């Protein structure tokens, strides 16, 4: 004798009636069929949805092979109580609007959609009491997340809850605002850098103005330079300040006033001596590298230079000769050596 799988054995009335029928041999009735179990009104919500009709057998009759149980619907009002697609429904709390995900019996079923265990829910509920009321916005019912066994994913609900919790503190709000608007935080630094750049741009402009004035004055200086040189040649002055002024005026006159095509590359050399003066000094230097005081005075009068100017020129010429001789010696040594 077989029973349907959905029939519960929790009702004592049904179990007792079956046992008594088997003991009193009233189980084998002479009627054409037997109806079991009898209907009862106190079955509650866990009622049987099917019932079986078994054909009756006489005593000591061999069980027929083709005998089977005819299944008929029982308690039809239960079908309207449940969903059409489900056989049983578990009521959800009022705060949880997320539907549960059903699995087969051999798979561990989780009741929550957002992938949190019971322990995790308890911990979070202690920190954020209104967690379940904030969930439906971030976890929509239309496209719920399916919990995968063995994995833990940090859903968006946890992030939104944390950000709402942190936004109460001023530090958290400031950091969030800095992350949302990084350009606004860098504005003071940019303004300081812009001020420095403006200062640097203003300095060259102010520096270019005196150069323009010197360029304008340079043609006049060129015209007056030969006269000044002739006057200096006639009247010999021993002060070094006059020499420095003369060299500065020559440097100003040498500044290129023409366009960039005629400009010369490289550093402009100081040439306070004329070609005639340098030629006479070079002749004397080849004859004698070191001068006495009397000979130096004679040369200074002949070349229209001061005693100090002639002395400095000879010192510089000796240093130049020394440098040239050193370079020539190094060049000869490197030429004789063979590198493997």
Curated annotation (Swiss-Prot):
CDD domains associated with the record: homeodomain
Disordered as annotated region, ranges: 200-268
Keywords: Developmental protein, Disease variant, DNA-binding, Homeobox, Nucleus, Phosphoprotein, Transcription, Transcription regulation
Presence of keyword Phosphoprotein: yes
GO biological process: adult locomotory behavior; anterior/posterior pattern specification; embryonic limb morphogenesis; embryonic skeletal system morphogenesis; forelimb morphogenesis; hindlimb morphogenesis; negative regulation of cell cycle; neuromuscular process
InterPro entries to which the protein is assigned, alphabetical: HD, HD_metazoa, Homeobox_CS, Homeodomain-like_sf, HXA10/ABDB-like
Record-linked PROSITE patterns: HOMEOBOX_1, HOMEOBOX_2
Compositional bias of kind Polar residues: 208-217
UniProt modified residues of type Phosphoserine: 238-239
Biased composition (Basic and acidic residues): 242-253
A GO cellular-component term linked to this record: nucleoplasm
Disease affiliated with this protein: Vertical talus, congenital: A rare malformation characterized by vertical orientation of the talus with a rigid dorsal dislocation of the navicular, equinus deformity of the calcaneus, abduction deformity of the forefoot, and contracture of the soft tissues of the hind- and mid-foot. This condition is usually associated with multiple other congenital deformities and only rarely is an isolated deformity with familial occurrence.
Protein name as it appears in the record: Homeobox protein Hox-D10
Species per Swiss-Prot/TrEMBL record: Homo sapiens
UniProt gene name: HOXD10
